A protein has these predicted regions:
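N-terminal metal-binding scaffold of metallo-dependent hydrolase/deaminase domains
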Residues: 1-47
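Histidine/acidic residue-rich metal-binding segments in metalloenzymes
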Residues: 11, 141-306
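Divalent metal-coordination and catalytic microenvironments
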Residues: 17, 35, 55, 66, ...
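Active-site metal-binding motif and surrounding structural segment of the metallo-beta-lactamase
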Residues: 44-58
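Metal-associated gating/positioning segment near the N- to mid-region
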Residues: 56-121
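Active-site mouth loops of central-metabolism enzymes
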Residues: 65-78, 101, 127-139, 158, ...
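His/Asp/Glu-enriched, well-ordered alpha-helical/loop segment
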Residues: 204-232, 299-300, 304-306, 311-378
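C-terminal cap of metal-dependent C-N hydrolases
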Residues: 321, 372-427
């Protein structure tokens, strides 16, 4: 499918870089003029490695396969313009927005409402999902064949598909259409009104907990169905150690499965929670052992990609503490910085592995092309403090507020057009 995007760009200057590809280092230049950016004086851009100078690093543009842009239907939380500007500021040249919208993109007519706004307002490439079920209500499958040429994959993100037979039918159709099923795995019968992980913090503070089985039980079911149907299957926002074990074993057995986790599950556990809405999301931040399992998967190659699950809400909706706030935090503008600081600088994974997780693997799995004009430039040497008041997103709720991090995005180019330039970098 083709990406949807408007055409925007700002003037910039030239930047000398030293390119680090698979076959060594060579001099090069990023030329930015009249809203266009391109790499020159070097061979074709190699997306399998970072490009570096003594001052700046140039990477292939990131792809976030799990974002909530909220428009149409909930533009008081986020708009396609504000969300894609936030994406560009975080180094993304493409995003895949989830279908929990109003109207839900469960038909071509409803999808067109979304894509018309994307064509008008988006500053990065946008690859929308189509819904698995009509209205994401779980009662009847959407017309997947009608939607397939126009969407990147199918998902009912925001809730799990509760019926085993319905998920089987969805996988059979998606397999025939050569499309992925992208699953929010959550058994609603096991939620028990919980608001955070069913662990030490919940017990100490008298809060209802969400058990890990609510996630891994549905992953277990779906992996069986994926093996039976041969459907390509991708699991969203994995948070617990049991899920990691299931996914590792399924890969070894030949199931066509990939999975993502989010920065907050890699960098936080429930010992760090506060009674603040910026720590509430679904699935919840879990225990130290779960985080350790995710870190091991990131290091040993089991983890396929990192996606933010960027889910903005209004300030009022996030002001009610852990028990009363809505699920969801923002992450597009700070994901790379938090991960580079917490995982690369600490030696958990290499910089190349982080780029694989954020840029290369998402493109491969979701068939999103990497053009020479899709790149992002970062300063990795100078720290800055995460300040939600500076966000381009309408959302301000992040557990990383106040963190000192390394990795500031200076420029993002999308198909040669400048989608983001840092004020300190413009000249």
């Amino acid at each position: 499918m083709a990406a949807y995007r408007s055409r925007r760009g700002d003037s910039m200057r030239s930047l000398n870089v030293k390119c680090c590809g698979m076959e060594g280092r060579e001099a090069g230049m990023v030329q930015i003029e009249a809203g266009c950016a391109r790499l020159s004086d070097r061979p074709a851009f190699c997306g399998s490695a970072s490009l570096a100078s003594s001052e700046y690093y140039l990477f292939p543009g990131f792809v976030d396969v799990h974002v909530h842009l909220r428009e149409p239907g909930f533009s008081y939380k986020e708009t396609i313009m504000s969300g894609t500007r936030a994406a560009a500021r975080g180094g993304c040249s493409a995003v895949c927005p989830m279908p929990n919208l109003a109207p839900v993109p469960d038909s071509l007519a409803n999808l067109k409402v979304q894509t018309d706004i994307i064509r008008s307002d988006a500053v990065v490439d946008v690859y929308p999902y189509g819904a698995i079920t009509k209205g994401e209500r779980g009662a009847e499958l959407a017309d997947l064949a009608e939607l397939a040429p126009h969407v990147v994959a199918f998902s009912d993100d925001g809730r799990g598909v509760q019926s085993r037979e319905q998920m089987r039918q969805a996988m059979e159709q998606a397999k025939a259409l050569d499309k992925l099923i992208v699953a929010h795995c959550e058994d609603e019968s096991l939620l028990n009104g919980g608001c955070i992980h069913d662990g030490a913090y919940a017990a100490a503070h008298g809060l209802p907990g969400i058990c890990s089985a609510s996630e891994w039980k549905q992953i277990e079911r779906d992996l069986e169905l994926a093996a039976e149907t041969g459907c390509g299957y991708h699991v969203c926002h994995v948070s617990c150690k049991e899920s990691v074990t299931l996914l590792r074993d399924a890969k070894k057995s030949g199931v066509d499965v990939t999975w993502e986790t989010a920065p907050h599950y890699l960098l936080l556990d429930d010992s760090q929670l506060m009674d603040d809405g910026r720590f509430r999301m679904n699935p919840p931040i879990r225990a130290k052992a779960d985080r350790e399992a995710l870190l091991e998967a990131a290091a040993d190659g089991t983890l396929d990609m990192i996606a933010t699950d960027h889910a903005p809400h209004s300030a009022e909706e996030k002001s009610r503490g852990l028990r009363g706030s809505l699920n969801g935090i923002v992450g597009l503008e700070v994901a790379f910085s938090a991960l580079y600081t917490g995982l690369v600088r600490s030696g958990v994974i290499s910089l190349e592995r982080l780029i694989e997780l954020m840029a290369l693997n998402p493109r491969r799995r979701f068939r999103i092309p990497l053009r020479e004009g899709d790149f992002t430039v970062f300063d990795l040497d100078n720290p800055y403090t995460i300040d939600p008041a500076s966000f381009l997103s309408k959302g301000r709720s992040t557990p990383f507020a106040g963190w000192q991090v390394y990795g500031k995005c200076l420029l993002t180019a999308v198909d040669g057009g400048v989608a983001w330039q840092d004020a300190d970098f413009a000249g």
